[in-house]
């Protein structure tokens, strides 16, 4: 099939300073104190991927009802100093590009949020993306070229109560195409930089990070039968946990991440009641002119979705990184690989 692609991307930024009118003496005093006037900034981008399909009967391309196919995104964000950010995204995919699932067809404002920041706290209400650690139990993200957008609509709180400590708590419903699943997600994450508490590590210029996270989902009861008279007793609440440790010193970087979840029968695992787990190990060293990387991963039954009966690429709560051999530009098709959520080693 002959295809003509047209990709257009535009980015704009508008900033304005707003400062109350002050007497000359007060204005000079404010400047001498080093205080900056509040700044209102408007940023945005427009991306439109357009395809003009052409029929070619000689090779049997078939035909399209639409003469123009497009995936168009418009992002806008309004920031007031460092305290408030309000934004949203308009998407037009009424006639999506080939390769996207049919449920992507539609248009509207699919993403909007408001984020407030004050001292050591940050609160987001609306849609947001989040990742705990390496994403083994929770990673929501957008990859529009692959048709992935599993954002959460709800609330998220981030705190920095102590030096080197970061806490996260969130809850909401996950996006599925142009709707949101009925199941409810919640979770928490804690990361502690131990080098900021242990003087010996700080003196040796070493970094030691400890992370813990919890992700849970509640999904309503559903009638699923494995035979005409055998109804499954499905768990309504599913929990997943993660613990990770990372050490850095000079050119060395060592990381270990282990995650597990309780029994979670779903279409992905053929409604098995087995528990799931994944272990991720990574070690690297680099210096001028030399580097090496060694990684290993073992996973079993770690497909984790907010809709147990879902298929395709939507509604995934977690993310399992893909490990494969490095490719060259000339041989990109060698060693093709896709993550196997049911298990791999």
Located regions from the model:
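Short loop/turn motifs that connect adjacent beta-strands in outer-membrane beta-barrel proteins
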Residues: 20-42, 78-86, 115-120, 124, ...
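Residues that define the transmembrane beta-barrel architecture of outer-membrane proteins
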Residues: 38, 66-72, 105-110, 148-153, ...
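Transmembrane beta-strands of outer-membrane beta-barrel proteins
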Residues: 41-49, 77, 85-91, 124-128, ...
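Outer-membrane beta-barrel translocator domains and adjoining extracellular loop/strand segments
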Residues: 54-62, 97-105, 135-142, 178-185, ...
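Outer-membrane beta-barrel architecture
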Residues: 75-77, 112-115, 156-158, 187-193, ...
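Outer membrane beta-barrel
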Residues: 77-173, 287-310
């Amino acid at each position: 099939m002959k295809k003509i692609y047209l990709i257009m991307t535009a980015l704009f930024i508008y900033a304005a300073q707003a400062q109350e009118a002050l007497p000359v003496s007060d204005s000079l005093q404010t400047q001498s104190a080093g205080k900056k006037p509040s700044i209102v900034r408007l940023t945005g981008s427009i991306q439109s991927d357009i395809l003009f399909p052409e029929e070619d009967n000689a090779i049997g391309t078939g035909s399209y009802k639409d003469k123009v196919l497009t995936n168009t995104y418009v992002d806008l964000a309004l920031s007031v100093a460092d305290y408030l950010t309000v934004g949203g995204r308009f998407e037009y995919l009424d006639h999506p590009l080939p390769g996207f699932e049919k449920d992507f067809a539609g248009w509207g404002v699919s993403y909007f949020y408001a984020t407030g920041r004050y001292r050591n706290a940050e609160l987001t209400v609306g849609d947001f993306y989040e990742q705990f650690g390496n994403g083994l139990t929770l990673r929501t993200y957008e990859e529009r070229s692959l048709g992935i957008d599993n954002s959460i609509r709800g609330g998220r709180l981030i705190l920095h109560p102590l030096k080197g400590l970061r806490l996260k708590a969130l809850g909401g419903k996950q996006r599925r195409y142009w709707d949101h699943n009925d199941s409810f997600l919640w979770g928490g994450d804690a990361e502690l930089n131990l080098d900021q508490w242990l003087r010996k590590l700080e003196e040796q210029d070493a970094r030691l990070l400890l992370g813990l996270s919890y992700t849970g989902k509640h999904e309503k009861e559903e009638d699923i039968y494995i035979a005409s008279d055998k109804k499954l007793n499905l768990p309504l609440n599913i929990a997943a946990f993660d613990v990770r440790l990372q050490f850095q010193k000079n050119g060395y970087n060592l990381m270990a991440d282990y995650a597990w979840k309780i029994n979670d029968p779903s279409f992905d695992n053929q409604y098995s009641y087995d528990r799931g787990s994944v272990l991720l190990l990574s070690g690297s060293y680099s210096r001028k002119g030399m580097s090496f990387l060694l990684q290993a991963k073992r996973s079993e039954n770690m497909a984790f979705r907010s809709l147990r009966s879902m298929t395709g690429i939507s509604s995934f709560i977690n993310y399992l990184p893909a490990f494969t051999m490095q490719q060259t530009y000339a041989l990109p098709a060698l060693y093709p690989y896709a993550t196997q959520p049911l298990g791999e080693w």
